Amino acid sequence: MKNLSSAQIRQMWLDFWKSKGHSVEPSANLVPVNDPTLLWINSGVATLKKYFDGSVIPDNPRITNAQKSIRTNDIENVGKTARHHTMFEMLGNFSIGDYFRDEAIEWGFELLTSPEWFAFPKDKLYMTYYPDDMDSYNRWIALGVEPSHLIPLEDNFWEIGAGPSGPDTEIFFDRGTDFDPENIGIRLLEEDIENDRYIEIWNIVLSQFNADPAVPRSEYKELPNKNIDTGAGLERLAAIFQGAKTNFETDLFLPIIREVEKISGKTYDQDGDNMSFKVIADHIRALSFAIGDGALPGNEGRGYVLRRLLRRASMHGQRLGITEPFLYKLVETVGNIMESYYPEVLEKRAFIEKIVKSEEESFARTIHTGSQFAEQLMDKLAAEGKSEIDGRDIFKLYDTYGFQVELTEELAEHRGMTLDIAGFEAAMKEQQDRARASVVKGGSMGMQNETLAAITEESTFVYGQTALEASLSVIVADNARTEAVSEGQALLVFDQTPFYAEMGGQVADHGFVKNATGDIVATVIDVQKAPNGQPLHTVELSASISVGQTYTLEIETKRRKGVEKNHTATHLLHAALHNIIGEHATQAGSLNEQDFLRFDFTHFEAVTAEELRRIEEEVNEQIWNAIPVVTVETDIDTAKEMGAMALFGEKYGKEVRVVTIGDYSVELCGGTHVGNTAEIGIFKILKEEGIGSGTRRIIAVTGREAFLAYRDQEDALKEVAATIKSPQIKEVPNKVESLAQQVRDLQKENAALKEKAAAAAAGDVFKNVKDANGIRYIASQVQVSDAGALRTFADNWKQKDYSDVLVLVAAIGDKVNVLVASKSSDVHAGNLIKVLAPIVAGRGGGKPDMAMAGGSDASAIQTLLNSVANNL
């Protein structure tokens, strides 16, 4: 059998499918673009959904790709098994309404078995199929597959809610009896038993039905366009070709493991327990790629996932004896392994290393904070007389502070406490269920719209025009084509149009359709791209219109001009962000409306006030310099040579539009813009905020709206000046600071008075010393506002030799708080409070020198105080 590197496998896959007329789709960003159903790109088909649901018609219906993907619903299994990964590569081939079952199976078999390609031994391949799908069974038989190698399984039907669905046929490679220690054999496949012998290497989904949850599967309707969706895991193929026992011994992971060996001084033993090595190697791959694609560690969403991965890897580093930040040192190795197809990791290496190292250092501080939380938690439990740490608290230590259960167990054991493991596992399961529920499987598609997909008439958007005459080519009303319509809403396609279809963050034009006499026959309320790319006008009709007639199309120029100002300002803002906070601040989303612009970008912290000031100043400088805005059409290679910034996630054809603003900004953009930056007038940032982990948002205004914003601020400042009796606006800051200083002085004075009062009260309490069995003690009820004040009393008591034991009781609201402190080796504070607390219907516990309890019966406070002497 061939011995192939991972790069050779990937290239051979793409070359084979190119030979079958497929176009290669580049690997997309791991952060989904315009798809809120996905946390991550989690399969090869996830980026092709627009083709499968018919909302966009691809240039070539045959597509192949090698797609980096992330799945995180089973993080805890990574490192425990031979094949679980967070980040992996999915190799795929796809047919959008072109070839179907026969070709997919035949070509798949050719790729797997031909000496020119993978050359797998045929007797090592097994296939599963859906029992009712005899067409697939017969196709495999026709290709020479033995019937004993074809296994029917009920699970071989791909379906997620409503939408495209169908049977699938999976291909397995038999690794032999060495991987079947109990000699179970083919039953491993037949009974779907988890095993290391029969490795699934490829799944071919035959998408031929529109699933409808309301009817039985046998009544599903056939899709108008049948599709092929396949996926093969590169890591699994590499393990087979390289004769590796697990995926981790392949050229995709082993170089990382070797680096970890150097850092830790430990040795990776293929036959031993190497979980920590595997976790680190897997997680740093996911971190490197995800951060390189713009996701950053944080407390929610994608950021939470990355933070969890980093902390898990860091904890496993500690298990290997690594005490300093080290994960960032592995980024270069990841980049070197993947450079041939994914150069972006090395290109962004410095930034990725900076983020990873910073997060490692932050985690070290968090571990310290977590230890404090754990100690306080156990103090509280002791005060309440409890000895078991609740499962949800264990989960919080694990989830928030990165404490592995073993670490929490060690801390608890030191305090004589146990763990609620069942509760922890329940909390963990809840989190996993939430994670799974938030992820829609990558292949999930919407229903196909056959009517819109069938529109093939050509239509051209004409730049620079606000009105023109056009022939009406298509009318769609009530989801059906018609020759004429007179009322309600309809979708229209013209042979040409001045209306911009919503795209690239720029909203659609609004306007009117007029007849030959100048009367308005329809109001355009939206324009979107049809599946084949034509501008599709949504209109409200006020008169009858017919296909073949000529109409005048007029856009609302005021709306267009406002949008253009904001769109050009967005380009200036993007460039300013690069210059001031770094080139990592790339666009993550934008909206250019008539009255404002919204720009989302990747950044790992809030933009400071000073940075915002510099950004605003720099953008306005470009506006006031009156720079011509030049748009040219060219090929993509020339555009890149010009230094044009391409937005990750946008798909560009061979011909592109390049928008240049002097030497300040060069971007690929299909939108409309002002002719000169001076037309923008002025630019003002209204707000900067975080909208998710690693993503910031700026909302800004231009022109008239910016003037109004400045005027509103001036009016507000005048109102403040009047309130604080400042004669001039420019004196407001000094006046406010003077008032603030007065407040601070009064607060200090108030605090000092409180401290004197507390000291006086403590002095009175500490004078009342009694004796019982040779032990000096103080037992008193005090008036305090919170339990913390009791500790302050105790701290003051410890500083001088007032007595051997202190017992304080306070009624706070409807609760009774009890504190016992002891300097005597004969009196254990924790034991004493366990006796006293029940008197006030409470319970508690603690250490020998300090203990606290809570109760509810304030009427028994004096009884408690009277009983102290009898218990010393």
From Swiss-Prot:
InterPro entries: aa-tRNA-synth_II/BPL/LPL, Ala-tRNA-lgiase_IIc, Ala-tRNA-ligase_IIc_anticod-bd, Ala-tRNA-synth_IIc_core, Ala-tRNA-synth_IIc_N, Ala-tRNA_ligase, Ala_tRNA_ligase_euk/bac, DHHA1_dom. The keyword Heme does not apply. It is found in: Cytoplasm. SMART domains: tRNA_SAD. It is an enzyme of class 6 (ligase). GO terms for biological process: alanyl-tRNA aminoacylation. GO terms for cellular component: cytosol. This is Alanine--tRNA ligase.
